Structures are given as structure tokens and as C-alpha cells.
């Protein structure tokens, strides 16, 4: 009892009040800090945090527009669309994209699947836009992703339309192919509508009419769960398909020309003489445009691009060759137009044409005998046109050649056309420093040289 009284007798009210004040200040400061932090998060960072929260719950999923169907002159489809199943990852939904790729590689084991790793730009600039890791995967490969979905947060399967070229190599150079936009494509985009991941025409009709064929993409606002899986669609904007295109090409005639060129290098162009419409345009060797749907490995592309037979080149447009005997029509027109010959003018062909000490042979070694213009054209007599070309002269031949459209673009609806060369005396002097010689005229009179 005395001990208890002794304890109370030592109690100091002033000391207690000081401790209480210190405790109150600690509480006040703590509450002030907490209040200011809440104010900062709610007011200063509120919009940003709400956006982050929304991005973690809502994804904007782009719905690709179908490209227009391409048909031949008879309405037969030669290019269609088909679904492609792509494996993508939402960079902002995972801690480390590299870890996700390693899990995928472990799942697929030795099946040869390759996944893109250049995700850095997407992670930084578009963290909630799916980034494609693999394109056009098979049903079996797709099933593995679905089976291991719990191990793959942020990984989604996109269904996108890709091109199906029904003729394969046969129409490759006319139609071209579609591929993913490159940095150069984005920099050169005048419309401002392209973005990373878009697919555009890279060559042929696909490139020439790309904006007409492409259409406008739509989109879905979808709610996702904690592992990035779709829960429901909140809103959908339907895509607008591209326009269909009908070509002048006849698919059946194209097939005939393609088979006739089997094992050969060169091109075939067939035009309708009634209106100049191109019914056939074949170039061999060629490439399969369907290979670009999956994304071509750099080694495979290098092999294709450096092939000495140039399968990527449309030889009907880009190849530059001597016109050969077709040029004899130009020589005949020049001779008639300048009054140098008439249809009844004859020359004697014994199989040779002599110019000084040089001999120029006719394809018919025994010669054609005495022939007029009509027979010279029918039998393609070289000697007849040697004579006419020499009399007309190179500069007049060049003038008539240009009137026929030689040396100028045809205006065909395909990219990559290269114009031919019409030689003149001035051109040779400028190019080689040597004067034009009569023998040069003899060679070009039959479309050679």
C-alpha cells in the first residue's frame, strides 16, 4: 500500500502534458502528410491514374478492315481474304515481355516457332496495344497457347485477315503482295493514316491501288480480367471494307502463258488489239506472294532478293531488252513517212548485206530473193530493213520510234515500269565520246544493238 502511494507521489503532470503534446504533433503531421498525399493523387495525378486504371481494365482492340477482292476480267476472284491467327502480347500488362517470350519458347519446345523480340518501341509508345510475336500460326500451335493461358498473362490471340493469292506464283508480279509497314513507309505516309503494325501493298496492283483496296479499320473496347483475358465487349466500331477491283487480266489465258514459259526466263504480255487491254502479263521466274503472310525470315528474304534469276522483278515492266524484229514496223513507217520507200519498193536479199568491209547476215541464210515491203514484213527479212534503215538514218528512226511510244512509259497501272532507250548520234557521242557510225544504224534497223 505504501509502495503504491509512493508511485503516485512521483507522478509529474507537466511531464505528461509535454509527452501528450509531442504525440499530438506526430498525429497531426502524419495526418497532414496523408491528406496532402491523397490530395496529390486525387487532384494532381487524378486524370493520369484514372487513365492507367482504365487501361488496366479496358483494352482498345483494333478490328482490321477486309481488303477489297481482286477479280479478273470475267469476275473470277484471284485474290481473297482468309483469317490469320496471330499470337500477341500487351506489353503494359506484363512485367517483362522477355520472360513471356521465354515461356512461349519453352511451351513450343523444338517445333521451330520463332517469336519477335523487338518490342521496345511498342512497350514505350503503345504499352496497351497488342504487339505481334508470331503470325499465321496453325490450329495446333494456337491450342498450346490456350492450354497454357494461366502461364501467359498479357498474351492474346488476334484474328486478322490476310491475303490469299489463288494463282500463287502465276499472278505474283501483276498482283504484288501485302506486307507490314516499314519505318520508310511511315515516314513517307502523306495521309497520316498509317501506324506500326499496319499491312499495306508492297508491289503490283496491291501497291498501286493500296488506298482504294485497304478500307478503314474499326475497333472494340473490351473489358479484361487480371491476366489480360477478355471479359466482355463494351463498344464496337465496325470496320469499313476496301473496294473490290476488276482487272483486264484473263486468268485462263494467264495460266496458258504461265505454263508455256515453264522452265524459261522472260515475260509474256498479250494485249487485246481492239482496245489495248492487257489480258496476260507473265514474268518468270516468280515468287509466291502467300509466303509474306507469315512474315518472311531475313535469310529467306535475302535469298529471294539476291537470286541471280531475279524472281522478284517483273520482267514485263522492269526488264530492258532489244525489241528485235518488232522494231521493223517502226523502220517501215519511217521509210514510208519520209517518202524513201513505197509499198512496192523492192530489195534483193541473198542472205547478206555488205557495208564497207562488214557483212550483216539475214536470219534466212539462203536469202529471200527480191521482195517488196509486204513480203519483207511477213517473212521478217533482215536485209530489206538494213537497206531502209540505212537510207532513213538514225535520227529519223529515233523520231519515229518515239512517235510509236518507245522510250516512254506506257502508263500501265503498275509500279516499277522502266522506259527503254532510243539511241541517237548525239546520245552516243555524249555517252561514249565516239561518233555514230553507219554500222550502228544497220544493227538498230532490226531492233538489235
For the regions a language model picked out, list residue spans one by one.
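Beta-lactam-recognizing serine transpeptidase/beta-lactamase-like catalytic domain environment
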Residues: 2-10, 79, 224-234, 270-326, ...
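Periplasmic/cell-envelope proteins involved in peptidoglycan metabolism and beta-lactam response
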Residues: 1-298, 308, 320, 342, ...
Amino acid at each position: 500500500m505504501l509502495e503504491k502511494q509512493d508511485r503516485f507521489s512521483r507522478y509529474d503532470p507537466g511531464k505528461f502534458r509535454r509527452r501528450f503534446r509531442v504525440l499530438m504533433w506526430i498525429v497531426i503531421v502524419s495526418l497532414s502528410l496523408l491528406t496532402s498525399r491523397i490530395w496529390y493523387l486525387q487532384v494532381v495525378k487524378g486524370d493520369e491514374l484514372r487513365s492507367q486504371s482504365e487501361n488496366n481494365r479496358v483494352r482498345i482492340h483494333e478490328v482490321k478492315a477486309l481488303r477489297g477482292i481482286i477479280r479478273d476480267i470475267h469476275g473470277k476472284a484471284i485474290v481473297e481474304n482468309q483469317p490469320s491467327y496471330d499470337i500477341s502480347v500487351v506489353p503494359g500488362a506484363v512485367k517483362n515481355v522477355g520472360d513471356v517470350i521465354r515461356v512461349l519458347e519453352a511451351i513450343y519446345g523444338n517445333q521451330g516457332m520463332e517469336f519477335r523480340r523487338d518490342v521496345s518501341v511498342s512497350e514505350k509508345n503503345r504499352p496497351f496495344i497488342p504487339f505481334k510475336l508470331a503470325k499465321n500460326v496453325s490450329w495446333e500451335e494456337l491450342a498450346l497457347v490456350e492450354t497454357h493461358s494461366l502461364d501467359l498473362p498479357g498474351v492474346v490471340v488476334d484474328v486478322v485477315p490476310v491475303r490469299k493469292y489463288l494463282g500463287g506464283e502465276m499472278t505474283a508480279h501483276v498482283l504484288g503482295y501485302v506486307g507490314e509497314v516499314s519505318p520508310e513507309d511511315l515516314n513517307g505516309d502523306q495521309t497520316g493514316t498509317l501506324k506500326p503494325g499496319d499491312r499495306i501493298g508492297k508491289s503490283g496492283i496491291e501497291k498501286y491501288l493500296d488506298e482504294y483496296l485497304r478500307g478503314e479499320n474499326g475497333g472494340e473496347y473490351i473489358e479484361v480480367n487480371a491476366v489480360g483475358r477478355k471479359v466482355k465487349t463494351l463498344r464496337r466500331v465496325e470496320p469499313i471494307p476496301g473496294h473490290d477491283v476488276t482487272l483486264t487480266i484473263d486468268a485462263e489465258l494467264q495460266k496458258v502463258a504461265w505454263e508455256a514459259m515453264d522452265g524459261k526466263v522472260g515475260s509474256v504480255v498479250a494485249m487485246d488489239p481492239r482496245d489495248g487491254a492487257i489480258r496476260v502479263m507473265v514474268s518468270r521466274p516468280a515468287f509466291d506472294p502467300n509466303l509474306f503472310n507469315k512474315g518472311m525470315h531475313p535469310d529467306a528474304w535475302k535469298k529471294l532478293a539476291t537470286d541471280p534469276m531475279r524472281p522478284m522483278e517483273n520482267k514485263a515492266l522492269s526488264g530492258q531488252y532489244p525489241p528485235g524484229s518488232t522494231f521493223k514496223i517502226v523502220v517501215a513507217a519511217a521509210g514510208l513517212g519520209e517518202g524513201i520507200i513505197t509499198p512496192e519498193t523492192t530489195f534483193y536479199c541473198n542472205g547478206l548485206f555488205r557495208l564497207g568491209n562488214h557483212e550483216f547476215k539475214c536470219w534466212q541464210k539462203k536469202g529471200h530473193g527480191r521482195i517488196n515491203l509486204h513480203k519483207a514484213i511477213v517473212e521478217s527479212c533482215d536485209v530489206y530493213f538494213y537497206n531502209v534503215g540505212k537510207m532513213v538514218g538514225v535520227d529519223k528512226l529515233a523520231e519515229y520510234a518515239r512517235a510509236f511510244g518507245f522510250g516512254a512509259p506506257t502508263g500501265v497501272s503498275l509500279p516499277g515500269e522502266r522506259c527503254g532507250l532510243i539511241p541517237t548520234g548525239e546520245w552516243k557521242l555524249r555517252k561514249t565520246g565516239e561518233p555514230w557510225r553507219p554500222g550502228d544504224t544497220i544493227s538498230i534497223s532490226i531492233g538489235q544493238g
